[in-house]
Structure formats: structure tokens, C-alpha cells
């Protein structure tokens, strides 16, 4: 009888990927990045282990959403105090903190436990095209989307 081989933490080879979010659709980008963070693109994927890679996302302020989501999509946060609910639209949050939009979309697609928090720490999102991780020699990860042509 064959036994399932669980990769050891030392044997996991982690790579760094660079993703340009310019003119990408938010959800389609987030699903691909979440899959790479989990390690589902590797043959050694194990659901209960962190086998994923590091992902750097640049140009977060140029990400797109379809339809009227720019005005209608709401982001909520609460200070924990009575009456402390703050509501903000996609457009206003994109002007203020565009990194948070991408981070929140990807975080919702990761496991909601300690493993998900560990995976989320391997995501680096930046507003502009510059990032401080050039020493890691990130590979460019191209994400192609099937867009409808009007």
C-alpha cells in the first residue's frame, strides 16, 4: 500500500512572483493570486501546509471592477465602539488606500484560520510600480483574463 508523502518544510522551494495589476479585473486577479499563495500551482500541494509562493502586486491603484461596482461596492469597518461603523465606496477607498482593496479581496479567498494568516503574510501589495523586493529576483506572473469584447 502506498503512503501519501507530506513535504517537509525544508524541502518546499518558495519562489517570488511579480504581478502587475494595471487594467486587471479585481476578482479574476485575486483568485489567481490566492491560488499561488496556497501553492495550488505545485504538484506538492498539501491542504494543511503552507506550500505556496510569495506574490508582489504592483500598480494596485490601477485595478478595475466591472459594471457599477465603483459606486455601489461598499467596504465596511468598525472601530469597536458604539456608532463606530464606517462605510466607504470602492472609488473613495481606491483614492485613499488602493492596497487595502486588493488585500481584502485576496484575504477573503484564503482559509479563515491560522494557515490563512500565515499565507496572507506572503502577499506584498504596492500602490505604484516600485517595490523593495528586487533582491529576491521575482518572476513576472502574467494573468490572462477572458474579457468580453464589446
From Swiss-Prot:
Task: List cellular component terms (GO).
Answer: cytosolic large ribosomal subunit
> What residue spans carry the region label Disordered?
130-150
Residue ranges under compositional bias (Polar residues)? Answer: 134-150
Keywords in alphabetical order, please.
Ribonucleoprotein, Ribosomal protein
| GO MF terms held by the record | mRNA binding; structural constituent of ribosome
Q: Which InterPro entries match?
A: Ribosomal_uL13, Ribosomal_uL13_bac-type, Ribosomal_uL13_CS, Ribosomal_uL13_sf
Q: Which CDD domains does this entry report, sorted A to Z?
A: Ribosomal_L13
SUPFAM superfamilies referenced in this protein's UniProt entry, alphabetically: Ribosomal protein L13
Q: Which domain of life is it from?
A: Bacteria
Keyword Zinc annotated: no
Q: Could you give a single Gene Ontology term from the biological process aspect?
A: translation
Q: Which PANTHER family match?
A: LARGE RIBOSOMAL SUBUNIT PROTEIN UL13M, RIBOSOMAL PROTEIN L13
Q: State the family named in the UniProt similarity comment for this chain.
A: Belongs to the universal ribosomal protein uL13 family.
Provide the function of this protein. This protein is one of the early assembly proteins of the 50S ribosomal subunit, although it is not seen to bind rRNA by itself. It is important during the early stages of 50S assembly.
How is the quaternary structure described?
A: Part of the 50S ribosomal subunit.
Protein name from the UniProt record: Large ribosomal subunit protein uL13
Amino acid at each position: 500500500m502506498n503512503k501519501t508523502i507530506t513535504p517537509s518544510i525544508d524541502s518546499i522551494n518558495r519562489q517570488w512572483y511579480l504581478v502587475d495589476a494595471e487594467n486587471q479585473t479585481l476578482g479574476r486577479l485575486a483568485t489567481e493570486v490566492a491560488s499561488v499563495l496556497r501553492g495550488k500551482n505545485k504538484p506538492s500541494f498539501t491542504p494543511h501546509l503552507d506550500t505556496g509562493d510569495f506574490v508582489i502586486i504592483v500598480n494596485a491603484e490601477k485595478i478595475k471592477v466591472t459594471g457599477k461596482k465603483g459606486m455601489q461596492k461598499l467596504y465596511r469597518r468598525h472601530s469597536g465602539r458604539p456608532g463606530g461603523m464606517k462605510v466607504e465606496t470602492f472609488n473613495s477607498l481606491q483614492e485613499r488606500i488602493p492596497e487595502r482593496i486588493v488585500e481584502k479581496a485576496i484575504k477573503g479567498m484564503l482559509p479563515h484560520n491560522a494557515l490563512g494568516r500565515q499565507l496572507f503574510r506572503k502577499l506584498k501589495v504596492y500602490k505604484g510600480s516600485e517595490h523593495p523586493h528586487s533582491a529576491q529576483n521575482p518572476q513576472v506572473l502574467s494573468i490572462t483574463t477572458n474579457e468580453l469584447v464589446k
